[in-house]
């Protein structure tokens, strides 16, 4: 089966979370907000430091908080829901149903495993938007922050990105 949302405007961004939210807000609400406004309304400025001596890299420093997207939706009064599903099959069924219903859906995963990304570094809180899939070809179509067109990613890479099993994971946010 193949399903893709064709009428989604992708505007490249400097940051994955604020860029994804800006594109989703435009799609669902018709609000054409600047990425900086999205970041500010989401109270995005924060500092988070993770120290994982056995990981690669051994530490991460973030300039934004973990709840920026939810905070933005709350500030704007927009219906927003995040869910965690550690089972890959159940997670795929949930987002598959969203796409079949014509609803682009933001996902979170480790950027390292997304096979269309050339820069390979572990970042398990990368935000991107699922726009469609082709199960016969084993691929999905993703709006990411770099390009103004959908990226093609294997379904296997998407599953590994969302729940790598052996490293820090966002557990299929």
Task: Give residue ranges: language-model regions.
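Noncatalytic regulatory segments and standalone regulatory/sensor domains
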Residues: 135-173
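Hydrophobic transmembrane alpha-helix bundles
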Residues: 69-82, 120-125, 143-151
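Short, intrinsically disordered/low-complexity patches at protein termini
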Residues: 57-58, 130, 164-166
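Cysteine-nucleophile protease catalytic domains, especially the papain-like/related folds used
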Residues: 1-88
